[in-house]
Amino acid sequence: MDYAARKHAAQTRKASDIPYLAHLLAVCAIVMEHTNEEDVWIAALLHDAVEDQGGEATAREIEQLFGQRVADLVRGCSEMTESEHGERPPWLTRKQTYLDSLAHAEPEVLLISAADKLHNARSVLADWLRCGDDAYCKFTAGKRGTHWYYHEIVHRYRLTGKVPELLLREVEETVARFAPERVDSYEAET
């Protein structure tokens, strides 16, 4: 936990002053309800470190400190951090690549991912209940893209058959509260 706290010390939750560590702890707590594997717990605490705090250099550091298994799980939970040209890819490219990766992800990666998406969906729901559609102004893809992504990720989890059913159902029910109608496609606005 100390490593996660240090890595994300300057980071807060999107458009808030909530320390990012709160999200990492929440994801880990959800994961702990579904497995007793310590490596999976550690990976849950570190699931955003590669994506948000240094890319592959951070993955190598995690491997040195916590082992290959933890590093592989964290890599599996991470969106692509750089394109072949060295810059961060556009939102839709990152999301589509991540969604596609779920088809061959191992069950532990899917568990961490679903716990992450559940906590994020709870945050979206709370913001939406508090602010209405203004809550979507902090999201790159706005309301339509956010709804598309959450419905699509639930669909992809279901296709794998590897996400614990109770967890999947909770993600699905939470998403349905702020996005009751499925958005079947999304194209980024240019």
Can you annotate each of these PLM segments?
Residues 1-190:
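Active-site helical microenvironments for divalent-metal-assisted chemistry
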